[in-house]
Every structure is written in structure tokens, then in C-alpha cells.
Amino acid sequence: MADTRRLRVACVALLLAAVTAACDTKAQFAPSLPPAAGFRVDDGVLKLWTGTVCDGVTGLTLIFDSGTQQSTEQVWTAPRPGVPVERMDLLRTTGPPAPDSGGSLQVQKPLPADYDWTKAGSLNFSVDGPKAYGARVDVAQILRESARHPSGSYLFGQRGWMDASDVQRENQKSFLTICTPDPK
């Protein structure tokens, strides 16, 4: 009877070890490198730089304070087949909520008139149309640090402030721009 008990314990331990070893902690469709997009504020305007061109964009979404009661979003859309996007003025820090992009992307869902995005903790950004990844950035850091960096440098989330040569050198090595295919 003791031998049967030991055999059961050994089988359970072996099964537990196999199940634990088989667990993958990464999301099934997560890219092999962290994705990022660049943001900065110049002359009171929140600016986007995707780092590389995103072709065929049919929509852009900014979500402030995602997952909280204060969560709110602004959405831009463009007709199919979409438009190329690399740099874009997104929002003003004061005054009317959105500058006129003058392009094919038009505000479909504006932020509420009384919403002050500069008080948000985070900004989540996503692109519709091409295969793309989302990006997240700290709003206070953008506002606080933009003036300290040259106008060609943008905050790429956890990657920090990067200019064109930094993005070209590091894209597909230490991070992915949001529209860069995963190299793996």
C-alpha cells in the first residue's frame, strides 16, 4: 500500500512538473520585442511619430487612463484603402481639443469637451488598418520632458527619448516601431 501511495505521489509530482514547464508566460500573439511609438509636445501640441511609416491606416485611437473610471478616447478614421501615417499633430494642451490634421484622417470621436488630457496618467495608442502593435506612454513624462529634448526627439515609452538615428539603429533590435513586422 505504501508503494502505491509513493507511485501516486511521484506521478502527481511528475505531472505537475510537466504542466509547469509547459506554461508560456508570454501572450500568444505578443511580439518578440516591445513595441513603441514616439510622442512629444511642441508649442502646446501633442505630436505623434510612429518611427516608421504605417501604410493603409484606416483609424487611430488614443485612450487616456485605460482601464480606469477616467478612461476616455479620441478616434480618427480614414476611408479605405487607408492613408500612410508617420507624423501627426494629435491634440492641443489648451484650447480646441484637436488641431485640424488637414489630411484624410478625420476625428470620428472627439474627447469630451471638458476633458483635460494633460491630467491623464497614461496614453494608449493603436492603429487600425495595417498589422500593427499598440503603444503606451506616460503623459506627465511627455509634458515634463519634451522641452528638454531637441525637436527631432520623441519619447518612445520605456525606450526613452529617441531621434531618427536612434530609431533606425534600435528598431528590430531592442524594440519595434508599431508598424514594423516582428522579426521572429
What residues fall within each predicted segment?
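Extended, solvent-exposed segments with strong compositional bias
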Residues: 69-115
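C-terminal motif of bacterial Sec signal peptides marking the signal peptidase cleavage site
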Residues: 19-22
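Short, surface-exposed binding/anchoring microloops in extracellular/periplasmic proteins
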Residues: 34-88
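Bacterial signal peptide processing site
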Residues: 24-27
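Post-signal peptide N-terminal regions of Sec-secreted extracellular proteins
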Residues: 31-33, 40, 170-184
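Extracytosolic low-complexity repeat regions of secreted or lipid-anchored proteins
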Residues: 99-178
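Bacterial N-terminal signal peptides that target proteins for export
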Residues: 1-11
